[in-house]
Amino acid sequence: MTRLPLLKRPRRNRKSAAIRSMIRETNMVSSDLIWPIFLKEGSGIREEIPSMPGVYRWSLDTISRELERLCLIGLKAVILFPVIEDQKKDQFGAYASHPYNIVCRGIQEIKKSFPQLCVISDIALDPFTTSGHDGIFYNNEVLNDESVRVYGDIATLHAEMGADIVAPSDMMDGRVRHIREKMDQMGFVNTGILSYSAKYASYLYGPFRDALSSHPQSGDKRQYQMDPANVREALLECRLDEEEGADMVMIKPAGFYLDVIMKAQECTHLPVVAYQVSGEYSMIMAASLHGWLSKEGAISESLLAIKRAGATAIISYATPWVLEWLARDALPF
């Protein structure tokens, strides 16, 4: 056979698994992953969420057993979300400031049992309000400054309970500065802030709202969440949050916004966390359950793409599976 006179043959670097692994530009490790946990009052609870196959609502006793298993295979960080009964919700989300609510007790118990874990608490009102909005909803509007004051109180409470990092997800103006000042005044100078800096008004949040029963009852979240068409606005939000005292910024969703992740990494000196949201996860799971694609392959590829775009860490509902694959050196790439 006559060979073509090719000086460059890039395929030489792909001819074996050993070579491909040696020169790989992006790798996944267990410390890249943050596991989101839905906590619910009660005991013995492990309820699968229909719109999120493989994701569960947990009571504190059952999550402790699962965390024990996952810590043995490399889990380093979790972020907590509360599932609140309707009778404990009101217009103002007052139960969010109660020191015995499920997220406060979750922070305490998880830090006590697993002190090595980084525990991140989501700072939001939508699980606690009857409106389902991320702030105080009044006269068809989410009130910015009044909501920010409440978030300062909630963040300080979570810091007191032992949260390593608080994560305000509301997209209210000025909330990072207020939370930082409030926590510092109360002596929690070492509690970090992971700000949801660019939280887009996405159609991909539906399964998450199913999990928390927090669908907005009226009004429009586009009044405060970002327009999916905008990227410069996201960079402005990242810079503002850095100036206000954030320790990390977040881009949410992740997979549809890889360009934003890349540009955010270039515009800030802070770590950039990306959230692979419920809709992204559920699309992959639905297709895999129909046999249309490989669950392992699609999840791994999606997370690799997010990290390749520049994410420092990734919040993903697939974290338990990925930890298992990493522990067995069984990632499909």
UniProtKB/Swiss-Prot annotation:
Record's catalysed reaction(s): 2 5-aminolevulinate = porphobilinogen + 2 H2O + H(+)
Cited Pfam families: ALAD
Primary gene name: hemB
SMART domains recorded: ALAD
CC per GO annotation: cytosol
EC number: 4.2.1.24
Role this protein plays: Catalyzes an early step in the biosynthesis of tetrapyrroles. Binds two molecules of 5-aminolevulinate per subunit, each at a distinct site, and catalyzes their condensation to form porphobilinogen.
Residues annotated for Mg(2+) binding in this entry: E237
Location of the active site: K199 (schiff-base intermediate with substrate), K252 (schiff-base intermediate with substrate)
Assembly mode: Homooctamer.
Transmembrane parts of this sequence: none
Organism: Chlamydia muridarum (strain MoPn / Nigg)
Protein name: Delta-aminolevulinic acid dehydratase
Positions with a binding annotation for 5-aminolevulinate 1: R209, K221
Residues bound to 5-aminolevulinate 2: S278, Y317
Family: Belongs to the ALAD family.
GO biological process, alphabetically ordered: protoporphyrinogen IX biosynthetic process
Entry keyword annotation includes Magnesium: yes
Top-rank lineage group of the source organism: Bacteria
GO MF annotation list: porphobilinogen synthase activity; zinc ion binding
CDD domains assigned: ALAD_PBGS_aspartate_rich (cd04823)
Pathway given in the UniProt record: Porphyrin-containing compound metabolism; protoporphyrin-IX biosynthesis; coproporphyrinogen-III from 5-aminolevulinate: step 1/4
Alphabetically ordered keywords of this record: Heme biosynthesis, Lyase, Magnesium, Metal-binding, Porphyrin biosynthesis
